[in-house]
């Protein structure tokens, strides 16, 4: 039973997550298998949906979906998505390349990302997906250090969300506020067509989305003009920086998924396996 704390209106349940955590990705899958939902809403812009879902179909091969800022339309450092090739290293995306100063927004298609796990599960169960974040010509991130996600093994998601709630502060700048209002408006629109909606969003944003949803004066800000999204292969040397978990741990999660084995405690057990594997080499 989902706690009232995580309900936004009569038809929306929110699952606040810490991005890049295998433990939160596991919690997303558990919740979606336990409760029937007729719609999944995620905090990503609609322009990312097609490329992201195509990339998810190719997991466990990781990739990245990129949207260049409008300020950098003249940049030529990326190839188009139709040149995506596993053997073509010339078109690999290397975020550690210091020779380029490109402004981009990107989504790492990483199975240990809670949002990716939610979309992947919804695709497998044929649940409609809606990307409800506002389109931005240059995304302004909002982040901070959060408590260790391993706490989920000792407490419920509801208790975790309640424990961090007093320390969650609103973002700065007009864009963050506009994004919150836009997502709240989209949830209102979805509530007309769906009765059991699951919203997967950052633990930093959900209290403000809930407040905006219940604001009678809520208005929907207009999206900004954008560039088309593109999808790229990732160079092996940068997986450590792209993936939320260590590449070795991510591989263990994918192997457990394929073998239908228990992966609840892989965040800790995987480190043990990593040390054993390193000792044997």
Regions from the language model: what does each represent?
Residues 1-281:
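Compositional signal for N-terminal targeting/processing segments
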């Amino acid at each position: 039973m989902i706690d009232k704390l995580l309900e936004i209106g009569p038809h929306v349940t929110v699952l606040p997550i810490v991005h890049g955590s295998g433990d939160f990705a596991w919690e997303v899958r558990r919740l979606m298998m336990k409760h029937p939902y007729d719609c999944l809403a995620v905090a990503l812009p609609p322009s990312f949906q097609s490329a992201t879902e195509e990339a998810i179909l190719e997991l466990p091969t990781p990739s990245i979906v990129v949207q260049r800022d409008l300020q950098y339309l003249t940049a030529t450092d990326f190839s188009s998505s139709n040149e995506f090739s596993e053997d073509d290293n010339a078109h690999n995306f290397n975020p550690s390349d210091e020779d380029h100063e490109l402004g981009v927004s990107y989504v790492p298609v990483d199975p240990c990302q809670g949002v990716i796990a939610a979309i992947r599960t919804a695709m497998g169960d044929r649940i409609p997906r809606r990307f409800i974040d506002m389109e931005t010509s240059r995304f302004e991130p909002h982040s901070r250090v959060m408590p260790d996600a391993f706490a989920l093994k000792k407490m419920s998601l509801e208790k975790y969300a309640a424990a961090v709630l007093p320390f969650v502060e609103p973002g700065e700048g007009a864009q963050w506020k506009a994004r919150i209002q836009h997502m709240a408006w989209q949830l209102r629109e979805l509530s007309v067509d769906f009765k059991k909606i699951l919203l997967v969003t950052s633990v930093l944003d959900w209290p403000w989305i809930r407040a905006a949803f219940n604001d009678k004066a809520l208005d929907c800000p207009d999206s900004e003009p954008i560039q088309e999204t593109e999808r790229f292969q990732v160079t092996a040397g940068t997986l450590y920086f792209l993936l939320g978990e260590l590449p070795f741990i991510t591989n263990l999660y994918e192997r457990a998924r394929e073998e239908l084995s228990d992966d609840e405690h892989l965040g800790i057990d995987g480190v043990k396996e990593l040390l054993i594997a390193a000792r044997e080499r």
